[in-house]
């Protein structure tokens, strides 16, 4: 006979949700920082400028 599973407690649910939101906030902060870096032109570590490529054009 089928038996229903135990209900997850509100505390456990809230812990998981808080962890997920924290991780999402960190990723959003990284993305914003990366975007700012690209816009200000300080993004040499992201898109290294190859000197030879610029000369060919």
From Swiss-Prot:
BP term (GO), one: translation
Key word Ribosomal protein present: yes
Keyword Ribonucleoprotein assigned: yes
A GO term from the CC aspect: large ribosomal subunit
Chain intervals with Basic residues compositional bias: 1-20
PANTHER family: 50S RIBOSOMAL PROTEIN L32, CHLOROPLASTIC, LARGE RIBOSOMAL SUBUNIT PROTEIN BL32C
Matching NCBIfam families: rpmF_bact
Similarity-based family: Belongs to the bacterial ribosomal protein bL32 family.
The protein, known as: Large ribosomal subunit protein bL32
Taxonomic source organism: Rippkaea orientalis (strain PCC 8801 / RF-1)
Gene name, Swiss-Prot/TrEMBL: rpmF
């Amino acid at each position: 006979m089928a038996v229903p599973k135990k209900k997850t407690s509100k505390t456990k649910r809230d812990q998981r949700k808080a962890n997920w939101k924290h991780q999402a906030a960190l990723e959003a902060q990284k993305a914003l920082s990366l975007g700012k870096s690209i816009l200000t032109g300080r993004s040499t570590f992201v898109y290294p400028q190859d000197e030879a490529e610029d000369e060919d054009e």
